[in-house]
Amino acid sequence: MSPPRLGLRENLPQFSLLVLLNAFVGGMVGLERTVLPLLGEQEFGLTSKTAITSFIVSFGITKAIINLVAARLSDRIGRKPILIVGWLLALPVPFLIIMAPAWWWIDLANVLLGANQAMAWSMTVIMKIDLVGPRRRGLALGLNEFAGYFAVGAMSWISGYIAAHSGLRQPFYLGIGIAIIGLLLSVVVIRETRGHVALEAPSAPHGPRPPGLGRIFWVTSAGNVSLFAACQAGLVNNLNDGMSWGLYPLFFAAHALPIERIGTVKAVYPAVWGLLQVATGPLSDRWGRKGLIAWGMIVQAGGIWLTVLVPSYAAWILGAVLQGLGTAMVYPTLLAAIVDHAHPTWRASSLGVYRFWRDLGYAVGALLSGLIADAIGLGAAIHVVAALTLASGLVVGAIMRGPAPAPIATR
């Protein structure tokens, strides 16, 4: 085997396999985006929006916590073992949903799915960063998120189509095949990338030994104003995504939109998000991170308000396009902003902290929007989330700074 080298061209075969693998990771969660809220309402007879969105709370909390642990562990034992365990945890998910006699089975399935997404998606992100080195991070992250979220969109549409013609549980048979293929790719063809970190580390400033997780958690969460801005934006970004995952299908169904069309609207948002990240990731390398993040949050807020204020299919499609555009501006750019400030030897742990806060947003968004929807209505919940998204973008515009010339100190 040839010695490791940094660069996209030098590692193109493995990089391409990781892009493909992340499409399978995204496909697993895309199966749920259209049908699970409708399943709770129509087959399990749930009337509480908070109860229906409980599966997103289970997913978000699990994913947030395991992001933190998986990233730190990957610095110690390697990326590939974490990736494989993530896919092993995905195997029971479709079976639990297909056979579920009670809603708590769905919650349990989403605990496992959250663990799968935390381990498998985190590792594909970290492994791509390891391979390409410091100069192409935006491109690497854009391609990674493109593959994952375009697959989310594709599977959202496919699951809606299948559900409209065959039943709400039938799409999850696809999940069995996705999980098996993802596991086989991880075991057979994906290689460990920790050796590439050793190549990059000498070019970064040297300091004391890598800090403990507690110190990294503080620095990433609040100790640096730019990293704080990124973490709060990540949380609010997934807060509005959690709301759209749980409430949009119910909101559209309340306006008598057929399941197949609900699937189309739900597919547009992640598909646009995924497709445009191919451009926005590299653009952040040229234009900087702050403007794309701040304006991206503002565009998202506009799309959410359009969805709730203009109840028509065309407006909902346009709202989904705007949400997808805004999220594409934000998602890979936030990851790159975190990486700008972290030393290579603890970069994975810092990304894990950011992803903890970001994915906790799923749980916060689902719980908050569900409680508001139960108290004063679906429309009010959507309005509140749009306002929070706008406020988050303004915070980024006010306090985020450009990347430091060197990774921040931890002491």
Predicted regions and their residues:
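Juxtamembrane intracellular "pre-TM" segments in multi-pass secondary transporters
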Residues: 1-12, 192-229, 411
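C-terminal membrane-cytosol helix-exit motif in multi-pass small-molecule transporters
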Residues: 177-201, 392-401
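Helix-to-loop junctions at the C-terminal end of transmembrane segments
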Residues: 66-78, 163, 276-288, 373-374
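C-terminal ends and interior cores of transmembrane alpha-helices
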Residues: 88-101, 299-311
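Helix-loop boundary and gating motifs at the non-cytosolic
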Residues: 10-60, 226-229, 233, 237-255
